[in-house]
């Protein structure tokens, strides 16, 4: 059986907070990796996909990119899912957040590693809505430039009519996801990851 190694790196949305933590564990269904792996078992049953969850609650885009660089120096990955930016928005400009994320994207591209760049999930605070929109627009624009870089619209999948986090996907604080929220983005990722692996002939 073929194998592939997928690095999932980011903040609490990658970790699975509040009901799951990659170190302390908890409810595995409160992580997008659970639902993504379940979906890939149907589309690619002949591949054993190993997911490395490097989500750290509270981490910023700069911290995520620093950890990404370290991770890629020691391990070879077939695919990276790099998600971040939520924790920056209260203290960092949208331009700087995007610059930090693009640094991480470029790190993957230079190593010729397939990359999925999700949008920042919705935040249920009006002041944050335009910030999320601005950064996400930049992420989508970046991904459109390259064949081996893929956009995953987490925000579009999770938001309501106000561009807030939809109630059924909300764990209760307007930022973190419920099990249904993690299921939503995990299922969303299945065809995107499937496409990325196809380009690598996996």
Residue ranges and their predicted role:
Residues 1-54, 69-76:
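Serine-esterase "nucleophile elbow" of acetyl-processing enzymes
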Residues 83-89, 104-135:
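Active-site segments of SGNH/GDSL-like serine hydrolases
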Residues 12-15, 56-61, 86-91, 121-125, ...:
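Solvent-exposed loop/turn segments at secondary-structure junctions
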Residues 33, 39, 62-72, 95-104:
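Alpha-helical scaffolding within the catalytic cores
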Residues 124-202:
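Catalytic His-Asp segment of secreted/periplasmic serine-dependent ester chemistry enzymes
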Residues 42-47, 109, 144-149:
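Short helix-capping segments at alpha-helix termini
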Residues 6-8, 51-55, 78-83, 115-119, ...:
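Structural recognition of the beta-strand scaffold that forms the well-ordered cores
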Residues 19-24, 91-95, 126-131:
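Short, solvent-exposed loop/turn segments at secondary-structure boundaries
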């Amino acid at each position: 059986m073929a194998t592939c190694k997928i690095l999932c790196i980011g903040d609490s949305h990658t970790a699975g907070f509040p009901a799951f933590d990659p170190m302390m564990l908890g409810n595995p269904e409160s992580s997008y990796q659970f639902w993504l792996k379940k979906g890939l078992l149907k589309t690619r049953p002949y591949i054993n996909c190993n997911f490395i969850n490097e989500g750290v609650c509270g981490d910023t885009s700069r911290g995520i990119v620093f950890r990404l660089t370290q991770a890629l120096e020691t391990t070879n990955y077939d695919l990276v899912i790099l998600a971040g930016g939520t924790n920056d928005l209260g203290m960092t400009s949208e331009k700087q957040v995007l610059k930090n994320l693009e640094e991480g994207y470029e790190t993957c591209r230079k190593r010729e590693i397939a990359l999925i760049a999700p949008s920042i999930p919705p935040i249920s605070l009006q002041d944050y809505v335009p910030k999320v929109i601005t950064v996400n627009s930049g992420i989508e624009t970046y991904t459109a430039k390259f064949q081996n870089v893929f956009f995953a619209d987490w925000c579009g999948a999770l938001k309501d009519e106000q561009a807030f986090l939809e109630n059924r996907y909300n764990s209760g604080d307007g930022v973190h996801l419920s099990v249904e929220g993690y299921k939503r983005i995990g299922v969303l990722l299945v065809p995107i990851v499937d496409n990325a692996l196809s380009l690598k002939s996996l």
